[in-house]
Amino acid sequence: MIKYALVGDVGGTNARLALCDIASGEISQAKTYSGLDYPSLEAVIRVYLEEHKVEVKDGCIAIACPITGDWVAMTNHTWAFSIAEMKKNLGFSHLEIINDFTAVSMAIPMLKKEHLIQFGGAEPVEGKPIAVYGAGTGLGVAHLVHVDKRWVSLPGEGGHVDFAPNSEEEAIILEILRAEIGHVSAERVLSGPGLVNLYRAIVKADNRLPENLKPKDITERALADSCTDCRRALSLFCVIMGRFGGNLALNLGTFGGVFIAGGIVPRFLEFFKASGFRAAFEDKGRFKEYVHDIPVYLIVHDNPGLLGSGAHLRQTLGHIL
């Protein structure tokens, strides 16, 4: 008989839940719920388990916020809870709550070739560190290392490091944004809102008034080639993505690969392929040769958060990935 665990990927808007075959790691019965419709994460879990008529005793939920102890308060949602209390209330034997990019990083060992698109570099070196980052509502970052037959995810808040410009245009962008918001983190330019910031700064640098555009508007106009400012913003976004990825590669010597997750880049894949991304990734001065062979991959799996939550839980329960 198949033994299932509950896995989840919870953001500021939606909660996506599924079942994970503990033996194989296969994900099934995925369903998305609007977080606005439920008073708590526990309530959503109860509805899911009732709808699917399944009893589970183990679970792992990935959440888009820092996890530093038993009390979890979501960054972009009103939900807050005690992990120990929810585990007890649900009657679980084991409940893990992890950061969303911890989950994405743990998905990487489970991905197949068809789940990845490579952007330059050579083959990954087995056993070497891995970096993963992705732009969405914010900028998520994690690293992954292999130690004693176990994968260890190194989460953090790397999206909030300083934005480090390396061209005259980028320096002007920094100056304009710093005057508006003070500290300018990488997330302020590498995210959905960050794309808007880039567009606004480009227009303001020319002493013009920017339109009130959303990230989707900027992307659509750039791809249609109907707005020079939007196209410049999207091009610059790709370049800064490259610079940031190259920095991650240098930090930990990620010869196991640098992986891009998140929902933004797949929306303009062909544009991204033709952009200055890879050149910027390798633009490291004296260390250009060092990063030259490090491969970069775009993750195109539908649910890396669910896959990684399952992988994390299975490893915690003693399985070798």
Swiss-Prot record:
GO terms for cellular component: cytosol. SUPFAM superfamilies: Actin-like ATPase domain (SSF53067). It comes from the Bacteria. InterPro entries: ATPase_NBD, Bacterial_glucokinase, Glucokinase. The keyword Transferase applies. GO terms for molecular function: ATP binding; D-glucose binding; glucokinase activity. It holds the Pfam family Glucokinase. Keywords: ATP-binding, Cytoplasm, Glycolysis, Kinase, Nucleotide-binding, Transferase. It is found in: Cytoplasm. NCBIfam families: glk, PRK00292.1-1, PRK00292.1-3. This is Glucokinase. It comes from Shigella boydii serotype 18 (strain CDC 3083-94 / BS512).
